[in-house]
Structures are given as structure tokens and as C-alpha cells.
């Protein structure tokens, strides 16, 4: 059985074929997002100019002196250029001067992008004709308020100096927030690391307490009643004057839907239909989970965490995981939760819970990345690096006829049906 997986996002877009034995019981479900046609320039522009909860961007832009356009980094699948182009046309037609428009990569607490990365996100023309900068979460911040829990809310100084802020992002299931989108382009996108330490640690504490009580529900694709989302909205309101554009994408990273407008109102409208775009069935019992890590190849802990969910049930605690990742770039430096040595970890570093009693974690990639295993959260005694698919199948050789296997087309966006 041959299955084609989309791979090499931002690195050539070359798919990867995998081959499974014909006598295996393979579950491979196509997500709804892959059954829809992508939007063209005209459709994207129409969505932007018919927003939810606020006036059209063309009206908001009138009389504005400085405009910043925020976009996410290489750990997100957002096809930024396709959305940035109609935005720029709207701004220029509304009288905003070209030299007064800047782009800022909303990196959160990730490492900086290079010019080459900017071009992959925005295209050669935009990078050549507009100022494009990286956010730094440690410096050049201003206080915009104090949160209810008492911590300072710090945001990028340049962002706050602009009188119109536009955010471009993708709305997909998120491992700690239910869904990405909305004000997340600000928090953590262009926020200070101390502010985000408060917000992330509060959410992490809530999830840890749920796990201890045996009530843990993996948040991807769920609007759970927990602190992170609410605090992001609370802090976001302090920033103000943000026009947000969130897109749905298919597994080829093409825009299939747009929600735009007020960051809170468009977020909840999008959330109503987001989960169904990306959900698949989770088998009650499975022997092998093959999860593709393409969109967030440099944050493969997300896809790995999705695979681990399949082994959380009391009756399914044994099985192997294959993580497919062909990205040359490796794992993104994460200054809040990353690893910076064998004993040196970032301030909120934690590890994914692996409830399996037995089972290997096979990292299928032409590019060895031993330190990356720390970032992904694979325990050393489970880790196998396979450079070829033949090596993967050798590592899975104990599995014979009737093996139940689940293949996940894109671990970064999938959520399981309830």
C-alpha cells in the first residue's frame, strides 16, 4: 500500500511516499480540508473586505500614518504571501504610504528568521520593497497594562508605535490553546518573554493538575475552560486596533477559507467550524502510528504528542510511533521551553507524557538530529533514527499480518473526533 505524504514545507515542497504491507489493517482518513478548493486573490480580498465585528480594512486604513503587518514564522503553515498581497493593495489604495508599511515576524519566543526565510514567507518582491523585521522577546518592549493576575503586559515597541496593526495567521488546532488564531499573533507573537512565561505557566499548571486527577483532555481542537486563551484575550484588548486575518489551510498549505476582522469575534466564528476541517477518527486500538510532521517540522513535538494520544487508553499502552520529518532546518530554538545543553533547559521546559509500557519511537528522516530529540520529547531508550523507509520497516519487523496502523497526513493540524 502506497501513501503519499506532503513534506519539505519551506524546503522545496517535495512529497514523500511510504509503503505499508498489504496484509496490514491500515487506517488512513482524508481530512475535510483536503476536499475543498483553494481561494484565489479575489476571494481572499473579498473575505478581508467583509470582516466580522469591525469595519473593512480599507476603511480602517484611511488616515493611518504607520501600519505594521504581523506574520508567523516557519513553524506555522500560513501561506503569508497570498494574504499579504491583497492587504498591501488595500492599504495603498486607501492612502497609506508605502514607506510607512512594515512587516514584523511574530516569532514569540522562537529564534530569528533570515532574509531567505522572509522570502519564503512573503516573496521576493515584498522583501525587496518593504521593511521586514524580527521580533525579539527580550528587548525593545513597552508596557501596555497589568493583567488581572498582577503581571506586566509587555509588547514589542515598534508594534505599539503603529496606529494600525494587521495580523496574518492560520487557524488550526493548537496543543495548549485549543486553536491558534485571534490574538495569538500578539501573545506570544510580539510579546515579552516574561509576560508569556506567566501566561504559559498558568495554562501548563492547569493541564498538569488535570492530569494528576486523571481528567486530562488533550486541548487540540477544543475550547477548554482554561486560563491561557482567556488571558491572551484579556491582554490583547490592551493592545487594541488590530485587524486579524486567520486562514484555514489544506495539507498542501493552500488557503481554503478566511475569517477576518475583530480578533475575538472572528476567532470564535472560525472556531465553530475549524475542528471539522482537520479531524479524523482515533482507533480504539492501534499497533503502529505513522504521523507526518511537515507544517511544524521544526516543532515536531506537536505531531509526536498527537501520536502519543493514541496510547493513552488503559487498553492500548503498547505500540510503535513513526515520526516523518524531512526538514533540513531541524528544531526551532525556543527560548522559553527549549533545550540548550544536556543539563541546561529553558525556564518552562517540560516533557511530553508517554504512557506506553512498550514501544519504539522511530524518527524517519534523511537528516540526523540527536539533540532535536530533546526538543521533540523522545526518550533515549525509545529512539531509533531511520534514514530510509526500508530502515523504518526493519524497525517494525515484529509486526505481522493484521497489524493495525494509523497514518496521519499532518500531525500539526489534526484533531481526533470525540
Where do the PLM segments sit?
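Glycine-rich phosphate/diphosphate-binding loops that line cofactor/substrate pockets in enzymes
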Residues: 52-68, 93-98, 280-288, 314-317, ...
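Short glycine-rich or small-residue beta-strand-to-loop segments that form or flank ligand, phosphate
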Residues: 66-77, 102-108, 289-292
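C-terminal non-catalytic interaction/assembly regions of soluble proteins
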Residues: 92, 305-418
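Short, conserved secondary-structure transition motifs
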Residues: 103-116, 136-142
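Conserved, well-structured core segments that form the ligand-binding/active-site neighborhood
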Residues: 128-285
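Long, well-ordered mid-to-C-terminal structural blocks that present hydrophobic/aromatic surfaces
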Residues: 265-334
Amino acid at each position: 500500500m502506497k501513501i503519499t505524504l506532503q513534506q519539505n514545507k519551506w524546503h522545496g515542497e517535495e512529497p514523500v511516499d511510504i509503503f505499508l504491507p498489504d496484509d496490514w489493517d491500515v487506517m488512513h482518513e482524508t481530512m475535510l480540508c483536503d476536499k475543498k478548493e483553494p481561494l484565489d486573490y479575489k476571494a481572499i480580498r473579498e473575505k478581508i473586505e467583509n470582516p466580522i465585528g469591525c469595519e473593512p480594512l480599507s476603511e480602517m486604513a484611511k488616515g493611518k500614518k504607520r501600519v505594521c503587518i504581523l506574520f508567523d514564522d516557519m513553524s506555522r503553515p500560513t501561506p503569508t504571501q497570498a494574504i499579504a498581497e491583497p492587504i498591501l493593495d488595500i492599504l495603498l489604495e486607501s492612502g497609506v504610504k508605502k514607506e510607512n508599511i512594515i512587516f514584523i515576524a511574530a516569532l514569540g519566543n522562537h529564534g530569528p528568521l533570515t532574509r531567505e526565510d522572509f522570502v519564503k514567507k512573503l516573496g521576493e518582491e515584498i522583501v525587496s520593497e518593504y521593511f521586514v523585521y524580527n521580533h525579539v522577546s527580550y528587548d525593545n518592549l513597552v508596557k501596555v497594562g497589568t493583567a488581572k493576575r498582577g503581571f506586566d503586559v509587555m509588547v514589542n515597541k515598534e508594534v505599539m508605535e503603529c496606529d494600525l496593526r494587521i495580523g496574518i495567521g492560520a487557524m488550526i488546532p493548537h496543543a495548549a490553546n485549543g486553536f491558534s488564531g485571534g490574538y495569538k499573533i500578539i501573545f506570544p507573537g510580539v510579546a515579552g518573554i516574561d509576560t508569556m512565561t506567566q501566561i504559559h505557566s498558568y495554562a501548563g499548571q492547569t493541564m498538569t493538575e488535570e492530569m494528576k486527577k486523571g481528567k486530562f483532555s488533550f486541548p487540540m481542537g477544543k475550547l477548554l475552560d482554561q486560563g491561557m486563551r482567556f488571558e491572551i484575550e484579556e491582554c490583547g484588548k490592551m493592545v487594541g486596533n488590530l485587524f486579524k486575518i486567520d486562514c484555514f489551510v489544506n495539507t498542501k498549505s493552500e488557503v481554503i477559507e478566511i475569517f477576518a476582522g475583530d480578533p475575538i469575534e472572528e476567532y470564535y466564528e472560525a472556531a465553530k467550524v475549524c475542528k471539522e476541517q482537520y479531524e479524523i477518527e482515533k482507533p480504539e486500538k492501534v499497533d503502529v502510528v505513522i504521523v507526518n510532521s511537515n507544517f511544524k517540522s521544526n516543532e515536531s513535538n506537536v505531531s509526536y504528542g498527537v501520536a502519543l494520544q493514541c496510547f493513552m487508553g488503559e487498553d492500548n499502552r503498547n505500540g510503535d510511533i513513526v515520526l516523518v520529518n524531512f526538514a533540513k532546518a531541524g528544531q526551532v530554538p525556543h527560548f522559553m521551553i527549549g533545550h540548550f545543553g544536556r543539563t541546561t533547559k529553558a525556564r518552562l521546559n517540560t516533557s511530553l507524557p508517554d504512557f506506553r509500557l512498550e514501544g519504539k519511537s522511530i524518527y524517519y528522516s534523511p537528516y540526523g538530529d540527536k539533540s532535536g530529540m530533546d526538543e521533540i520529547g523522545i526518550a533515549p531508550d525509545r529512539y531509533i533514527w531511520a534514514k530510509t523507509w526500508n530502515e523504518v520497516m526493519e524497525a517494525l519487523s515484529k509486526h505481522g499480518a493484521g497489524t493495525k496502523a494509523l497514518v496521519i497526513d499532518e500531525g500539526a493540524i489534526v484533531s481526533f473526533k470525540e
